[in-house]
Design a protein with these regions (language model features):
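Beta-strand-enriched cores of mature, soluble protein domains
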Residues: 1-151
Length: 151
């Protein structure tokens, strides 16, 4: 049976100034603080809790590897842990515009990830039993993500 995608939620997160870590065996590492934000979807909505971060690195082939970890607080006060690992890459000229904080159409670059959730027992524990993918758009001070459940 062929799987389909079902919209889970749309998330907007405000980002802090990247903290350069430097060269590592993986590539050029930086930490991007996640300051907060909001999310909404057909089955859940709430806020992005400040305090998370994206421990990303840029490989030699100029692919950015995203390794984000953060919390979501639902409208009914349940905390959901998110781990999101993905890739962002595109033509050099497009990446330079993104780095400069310019507005770039997300269709000009590839930004995909595979989020996973850790939810407590209760109304959202179904998140622990599904696989998800997401697509994203990077902006100067924020990120916009669309999460999909693989059916």
């Amino acid at each position: 049976m062929r799987p389909d995608l079902e919209l889970l939620l749309e998330l907007r997160a405000n980002l802090g100034t990247p903290i350069p870590v430097g060269a590592t065996p993986d590539g050029l590492r930086r930490v991007v603080p996640i300051l907060g934000g909001s999310f909404e979807g057909p089955r859940l909505r709430g806020e992005v809790v400040g305090g998370g971060a994206d421990w990303q690195y840029v490989r030699q082939d100029q692919v950015t590897v995203v390794e984000a970890q953060y919390l979501l607080r639902t409208h009914d006060d349940v905390l959901l842990q998110v781990q999101n690992r993905g890739l962002r890459h595109g033509p050099q000229e497009v990446l330079e515009r993104l780095s400069a904080g310019e507005k770039v159409d997300p269709g000009e670059y590839y930004f995909r990830a595979a989020p996973s959730f850790s939810a407590p027992a209760g109304p959202y524990d179904w998140l622990n039993r599904s696989l998800f993918v997401c697509s994203g758009a990077r902006h100067a001070l924020s990120v916009h993500l669309w999460f999909y459940r693989i059916t």
